[in-house]
Amino acid sequence: MRPLTSGLSLLVILSGGVAGRVAGQEGGAVSALEYEGWRQYSVHCARCHGQDALPNPVAANLLVSMAPGGPAADKAAFIKVVRDGRPERGMPASGGVMTPEQIEAVYAYLKGRAEKRIPAGRPKEPAEQPKQESKG
């Protein structure tokens, strides 16, 4: 009975490791700002707009809205909509919940998704930048 248990344990460990690597590789490399945007989007926006900002019947298609020429492609227009909301369409104002920096980070993430630079899925967390020593 012991070899079977060990074999099953090994199989579970190996399959979990492979699944973890695949899931981690699903999204592409992003900037620190885009990664923070993904984090903020996941907390504040995904409930209605979907985890990957894919089209759905509940909320606006952000990939179309944020694409070049779209109604929210302009950064100022995007910030205004997020800050003030669109009550007539059921979108709440987030200006009192999100900081301007958080809104700008979400803009960077969604812009990358709309421009197809950032694939669906959890983006790969950017590596920490080495600190530069000051000369003096």
Predicted ranges, named:
Residues 30-52, 77-84, 136:
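Sequence/structural segment immediately N-terminal to covalent heme-attachment motifs in c-type
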Residues 24-31, 39-43, 92-136:
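Flexible coil segments in periplasmic/lumen-exposed cytochrome c-class electron-transfer proteins
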Residues 7-17:
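Bacterial N-terminal signal peptides
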